[in-house]
């Protein structure tokens, strides 16, 4: 039996075999067979929970509380808000999901395996759960170097991660970028869009071409940062040798780790950087396994994550067959 799945944006349709059906939604071992298990409680996962609840699907979201969005001091390009802090946005999404009866659980999924009867079986907090489909929205983790004071600076709001989200608000201010790779150089060049006063801390691993580009853009390069302090209304960076630099905002560019181990454990195809490869409907290379958000895209934007979730859950809903009231 085949069902048609909704197009990502154009209304196109793709046929794919429907997930295995269990008449009473219970497996032979007595586990509740969900329509969908959502792993990850960031913007993508919570949006998915809202959609599936409104589609009247049996779904559970399991979140370990590690959403990167919780570290955003303020995002100014999320539609509908002049500026909203990451924790506030997550709280609003949770409230909206619960309004429609969504099931939200705190915990960490440690194993995810194919289910003999079809679908998947997962373990979390010592419990078992089974689902016909799974949506992974576990995001990524930013690398944190051993720089004194850097982590506390994140919570003070002077250390930020997303220049697309708040670079505009740093217009003509003193901006620092922390990192020694070409990726850090690209972030510094992007921030040059907003200010002439951009300083890069560390360039040990940069290519010669990147060094030339930074010089042509008028971006200064200082030594390796060893300490970050956040006095009132700013940030101070101390480098090896003792020199200090007073800035208004600092952006780390130290790389990140995609949390795709659950997907790769099932054999899902990934890029060299660990991002899960999906089609236009957020389907991975593993049948009935979907992915959304930062785990998929290197454009780490809240709006992108919520869009992924809307596409994935509509495809999931259509693939499961009708659920008349």
Where are these regions (language model features)?
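Internal hydrophobic alpha-helix adjacent to the cofactor/substrate pocket in enzyme cavities
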Residues: 54, 197-203, 304-325
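Active-site glycine-rich loop that binds ribose-phosphate moieties when present
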Residues: 157-164, 174-187, 208
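FAD-site-proximal beta/loop scaffold in flavoenzymes
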Residues: 152-169, 254-304, 311-314, 318
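Beta1-alpha1 glycine-rich phosphate/pyrophosphate-binding loop at the start
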Residues: 34-88, 179-205
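A Rossmann-like FAD-binding core segment of flavoenzymes
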Residues: 91-92, 97-123, 129-131, 193-275, ...
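Extreme N-terminal leader/targeting segments of oxidoreductases
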Residues: 2-8, 13-34, 91
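FAD-binding core/adjacent interface of flavoenzyme oxidoreductases
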Residues: 2, 25-36, 104-173, 238, ...
């Amino acid at each position: 039996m085949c069902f048609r799945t909704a197009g990502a944006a154009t209304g196109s349709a793709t046929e794919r075999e429907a997930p295995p059906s269990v008449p009473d939604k219970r497996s032979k071992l007595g586990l509740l067979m969900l329509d969908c298990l959502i792993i990850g409680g960031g913007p993508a996962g919570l949006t998915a929970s809202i959609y599936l609840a409104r589609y009247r699907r049996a779904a559970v979201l399991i979140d370990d509380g590690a959403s990167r969005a919780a570290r955003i001091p303020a995002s100014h390009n999320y539609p509908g808000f002049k500026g909203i802090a990451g924790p506030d946005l997550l709280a609003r999404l949770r409230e909206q999901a619960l309004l429609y009866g969504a099931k939200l659980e705190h915990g960490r999924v440690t194993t995810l395996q194919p289910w003999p009867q079809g679908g998947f079986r997962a373990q979390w907090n010592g419990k078992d759960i089974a689902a016909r489909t799974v949506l992974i929205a576990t995001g990524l983790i930013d690398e944190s170097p051993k720089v004194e004071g850097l982590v506390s600076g994140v919570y003070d709001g002077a250390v930020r991660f997303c220049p697309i989200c708040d670079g505009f608000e740093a217009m003509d201010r003193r901006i620092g970028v922390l990192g020694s790779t070409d990726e850090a150089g690209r972030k510094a060049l992007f921030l040059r869009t907003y200010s002439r006063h951009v300083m890069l801390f560390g360039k040990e691993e940069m290519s010669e071409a990147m060094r030339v580009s930074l010089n042509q853009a008028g971006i200064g390069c200082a030594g390796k940062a060893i300490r970050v302090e956040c006095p009132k209304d700013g940030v101070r960076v101390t480098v090896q040798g003792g020199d200090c630099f007073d800035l208004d905002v600092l952006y780390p560019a130290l790389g990140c780790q995609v949390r795709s181990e659950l997907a790769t454990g099932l054999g899902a195809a990934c890029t060299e950087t660990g991002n899960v490869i999906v089609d236009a409907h957020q389907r991975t290379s593993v049948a009935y396994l979907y992915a959304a958000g930062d785990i998929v895209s290197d454009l780490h934007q809240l709006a992108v994550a919520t869009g992924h979730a809307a596409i994935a859950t509509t495809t999931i809903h259509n693939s499961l067959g009708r659920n008349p009231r």
